[in-house]
Every structure is written in C-alpha cells, then in structure tokens.
Amino acid sequence: MKFHVLTLFPDMVMQGLMTSITGRAVQQKKIDIDAVNIRDYTQDKHGRVDDYPYGGGAGMLMQAQPVYDACQSVMEKIPQNKKKRVIYVTPQGIPFTQAKARELAAQDELLLLCGHYEGIDERVLEEVVTDYISIGDYVLTGGELAAMVIVDAVARLVPGVLGNEQSALTESFHGELLEHPQYSRPDVWHGKKVPEVLLSGNQKHIDAWKKEQSILRTKERRPDLYARYVRLQECRQLLMKQKLLHIDMIELINRGRAQLLYFGQGQILLKDMEYEIYFHACVDPSRLPDIRTWTLPVEKIPLAVLHQEEMIPY
C-alpha cells in the first residue's frame, strides 16, 4: 500500500513516520510513504504558495494551482485499475475512527492533503478531494500531524505490518468494545497483584474475564461505544431466533466487523466494515419495507444489500 502526503513540510512528515512500526514497514516494503512538497509545484518565482483570501479575513490561504499540480503529479503515476482516495485533513471533516481506518486500508493508494495557514482554496478541494476527515474538534498549525495519525492507523491494518497479526484484532476499538486491562511481570507491584484468573492457566476463564472487563471498561470510559455495543447485542438476540437463516450476520457481529446502520420496524441492516458489503434481515416479514426509502448514515451503498433470499442491487 502506498501513502502520498502532500505537504509544505515533507521533512516533518518523514521524520515522524520513518520510526517505529511504520518505519520498519517501509524498510520491509510492506508499505511505501512518499512526502510530496507542494512548494515544488508553485509557478511563483519567489516560491510562494499562499495569498490573501478574497472577501478579507485574517491570515493567508494556500492557492489552488500548486496544490492541484502536486496532486496531479501523483495521480498521473497511479495505474487506472488501482483503488485510490484523496483525503483532505480538516476539522470540518467526518470523525476519523477505526472503522474508517479499515475502510481506507482496503485502498491501494491514499493521497493525504495537508492544509496550512487558513486552509486551501475551495475550488481545488472541490476538484480533487474524495474524503474530508477530522481527527478531532480542535485546531492544529497544519494538517501534517493529522495525516501522520491516519497513516499510522491505516498502516497497522495492512497485512504483514504488525509482527503479530492478531494484534490488530484484539486491541482497543476492534469492534465496539475497548481493550481489557493488561498486566506484565512482576506478579505484585506497589502492593497491587495481577488478577488471579490471569495466572490460572485456564484459557476459558481468562477469555471470559477479558470479555467482562472489556464491557465494564467500555461502559465506564466510553458510554457512546457501550450504547452501540448493547444495540448490536439486541440485534444478535433477534437474529439468533432464526440462527440458520441469519448465521452470516451473527458471525459478522461476533467477529467485531458489524456496523449497525438500521434497527427498527422489524428490520436490521448491517455493514461489513472490512469488505463494505451490506446485510439485511427482515425479522418481521409482515413489515418488509422498500429499502430505498430508508434514511441511512451513508451517501450510497456501493455494492449491494445482501438480502437473505436474494441479492438486491442498489
């Protein structure tokens, strides 16, 4: 997988990403990271890439021309058959989540555009950007730190990047639950003991403890995630009433890959966050609606809704 970071500060980006896991992944050729200096594409003889905004206002604005040319220089090198996205990191974007990281990890190449000053001319954003993503409701000096966060989170999901492939499946934010508390040697530290169950060697009891602690921690620290988890479990209980018919959706929930899009009127709609496939279950056949009339938290369904009886093109 290739990451192209379009920035005014390429050294900052490369210094941050060429260490630890992402740095090793580049050395092992699991991923490729390219920092493109937008300033190299300006037509201004003084090397300027910014100007005053029309209509007044504080600060300077990055101009459209150097941003567009930098982006095009990268896009021209990407084969047409490669899956690619152009991401503008901005507080105005959708929140970056682990689900979004999984979605982006399915791409072949990602271009991350970093703004600076007061932002970038809106016209070039309208022309090249496919995704607007925010890492939080606060303001940074530029988009570089946000871009590095996204690269790190997505890179971890690329096969072979993590030494232990199970790490990405068990750490915080896989599924709807936070990770359970963890302990290492010594058994006792500052008078605090490691929970006895972890020393018991009984894997069944250990797994049950981990699940219980994950639920408790999520409820305490992230009530928003806990509410989503409870809702998914309610769906699972309904689906279990016709287990053979809905086994695919049940497994999706069990594996932490299910995103609940709709639950009501006897209908359940789930999204497989890894493969972007949609699963529909009608748990009350007497109330089967027209799926196209639903108001969903997605712009469109890119593949199809997988109905239990047939594939329904969307």
Language-model features, listed with the residues they occupy:
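N-terminal nucleotide/polyanion-binding subdomain common to many enzyme families
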Residues: 1-78, 204-220, 224-225
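Hydrophobic/aromatic beta-strand patches that form the interior of the parallel beta-sheet core
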Residues: 4-6, 34-36, 85-87, 110-111, ...
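S-adenosyl-L-methionine/SAH cofactor-binding core of RNA-modifying enzymes
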Residues: 63-116
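Structured adenosyl-cofactor binding patch, chiefly the S-adenosyl-L-methionine
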Residues: 120, 124-171
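Internal, active-site/partner-interface "lid" segment
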Residues: 145, 157-196
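Active-site beta-strand termini and strand-to-loop segments that position acidic
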Residues: 270-273
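Pre-active-site segment of Zn-dependent metallo-hydrolases
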Residues: 275-314
